[in-house]
C-alpha cells in the first residue's frame, strides 16, 4: 500500500545466546547453562555450513547473556574463526535487508 517492502531476516534458536545461557527460574528455565566451548562448537559448525551454501549467519545476542567474560572470549574466538574465511563480510542487519528489498 505504501510502496515499502518487508524483509524478514531468518533467525534460529540454535544461533541465539538465550537458550544456551539463560537461567531464569521464574520462566521455568532452570538450565543447565551450556559451557561457552560447547556453544562455540555449535556456532562455528553452523557458520561453516551457512558459508558453504552462501547464506547469512545471523547471531541473536543479548548483552545480559553474552556479556560475561568467558562468553565474550568465546565470541572473540568465533569472530576470529569467521574472519579466517575468504570473502566474509560483517554487515548490519539493515544492510542485509536492503540487499533483498
Model-derived segments and spans:
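C-terminal domain-boundary segment and adjacent tail
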Residues: 33, 37-101
